[in-house]
Regions:
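Hydrophobic alpha-helical membrane-insertion segments
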Residues: 91-108, 257-266, 327-331
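Non-cytosolic membrane-interface motifs at loop->transmembrane helix junctions
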Residues: 48-55, 83-85, 202-215, 286, ...
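Hydrophobic cores of alpha-helical transmembrane segments in multi-pass inner/ER membrane proteins
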Residues: 62-70, 99-103, 142-154, 216-231, ...
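Long, contiguous internal "core" modules enriched in hydrophobic/ aromatic residues
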Residues: 15-35, 129-300, 317, 387-390
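Transmembrane-helix bundle segments that line or gate the permeation/cavity pathway
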Residues: 55-165, 179-182
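N-terminal regions that are enriched for targeting/export leaders
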Residues: 2-62, 130, 392-401
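Juxtamembrane "helix-exit" motif on the non-cytosolic side of transmembrane helices
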Residues: 38-45, 196-203, 340-348
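TerminUS-proximal long segments
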Residues: 20, 118-123, 303-308, 312-401
Length: 401
């Protein structure tokens, strides 16, 4: 028990986290009230599109934490040991995300053309896709996604907590053994979920790379949140004497790798579709490269890839706590813009339009999510006291200047 206390949150930090939790909850409740007002004052389709932007981003934040913690369990890297507990806290928000998906499931007829019989009756392509794109199967798949994610997340968190209590080395092996197939299962199920919730907004369109782009974006979102949080946690015990510049440099390298991978996959998708020039594929880009939406695309090219790429090349910037924290927060903002760009042009293909709900929904849902996240973070020691590689992680970069 003394080992566990050694890595418990400092009292001052607990006070701050409770403040963050309460503040986030207040923001979330104000956001919910604003969403209710929006529900009664705008069209069902606009409300649900805006809600989908907020839901999909924060659901992706939870799943980004999920895949990152599995990578950490598998590799045992020092970079991940000090962020394991925040990542685990992020994964346990899956229960909230399972509730937040309900408006999408309930509003399916207003949100998706393939769920509207009058539209399907005059569309041969949608008729051919009805075996997959039908409402009962859509609901069943959503339940399956959360059942699968929830089961793996519950097992990982249970074994991690049990390892804290017992120090049983077999549990580390169990975490590693489940995480391997878990990463594959996550990628597979998230590809289908992205197809269901986002790609099917434009049901004639398809892309085989799309699911991978979504998965990488989620990992980038999750890591950005955790890096921003880690710098804050590093001001308090027990992490104030543990987090080194080398830890931050390693996490900065991982951020850079994910930024580059997102850009590579996005560019690959564009080149493949543009060179193929097939009517059912090219329409997705013609909607996003015209009517003002091209400026959002340019913003993503410059600020989602170019700017963070240049910043993260610098080792000095990666090792500077304040700078890497600002970069991480900045990436979170452009990640929301990316999700907005994926969803909204399907509703307004002719011209750019930003509805006030497009701003309110991510903030409101984010308040609820962050409140749950900060609550989870307070429930366990900030470091896993009996993890096999903990000592190596604590000494990572300790003697470097």
């Amino acid at each position: 028990m003394m080992i566990e206390n050694q890595y418990s949150l400092a009292p001052a930090l607990n006070v701050d986290l409770r403040k963050f939790q309460r503040t986030a909850l207040i923001v979330g409740m104000i956001g919910v009230i604003a969403l209710i007002i929006g529900f009664f004052t705008t069209t069902a389709e606009q409300f649900l599109r805006s809600y989908l932007v907020g839901f999909f981003f924060w659901n992706g934040m939870a799943l980004g934490c999920f895949v990152l913690v599995m990578i950490q369990y598998m590799t045992g890297g020092a970079w991940g040991m000090i962020i394991r507990r925040p990542l685990e806290a992020g994964t346990r928000t899956w229960t909230l995300c399972a509730l937040l998906v309900l408006p999408i499931l309930i509003g399916v007829h207003s949100l998706y053309a393939w769920a509207q019989p009058a539209v399907v009756a005059h569309d041969k392509v949608l008729q051919d896709k009805q075996y997959y794109l039908n409402v009962p199967f859509f609901w069943i798949r959503a339940v399956l996604y959360y059942a699968i994610w929830g089961t793996i997340i519950t097992l990982l968190n249970r074994w991690s907590l049990e390892q804290d209590r017992t120090g049983d080395l077999k549990l580390a092996k169990k975490l590693e053994t489940l995480s391997g197939p878990g990463i594959v299962i996550y990628t597979f199920t998230m590809t289908f979920a992205a197809t269901d919730w986002i790609m099917s907004l434009e049901p004639h369109w398809f892309s085989t790379i799309y699911g991978f782009i979504i998965c990488v974006g989620q990992a980038l979102s999750g890591l950005s949140l955790i890096v921003a949080l880690l710098v804050f946690l590093g001001h308090f015990q027990p992490l104030s004497g543990i987090v080194t510049k080398r830890h931050l440099n390693d996490l900065g390298k991982l951020l850079l790798a994910l930024v580059m991978l997102w850009a590579y996959l996005s560019f690959s998708q564009l080149i493949l579709i543009w060179s193929g020039n097939l009517p059912e594929e090219i329409t997705w880009y013609t909607a996003r490269l015209n009517g003002g939406w091209q400026y959002v695309g340019a913003i993503l090219l410059i600020f989602h890839f170019g700017f963070p790429f240049l910043l993260l090349l610098s080792q000095a910037l990666k090792k500077n706590p304040k700078t890497i924290q600002r970069i991480a927060i900045y990436i979170i903002v452009v990640r929301i813009i990316d999700v907005f760009w994926l969803i909204e042009p399907s509703l307004h293909p002719a011209h750019f339009q930003l509805h006030w709900l497009d701003v309110v929904a991510p903030i409101g849902i984010g308040g609820l999510w962050l409140s749950h996240f900060f609550y989870n973070l307070q429930q366990r020691p900030i470091l896993p006291p009996n993890a096999p590689d903990l000592e190596k992680a604590l000494n990572h970069g300790r003697h470097q200047h």
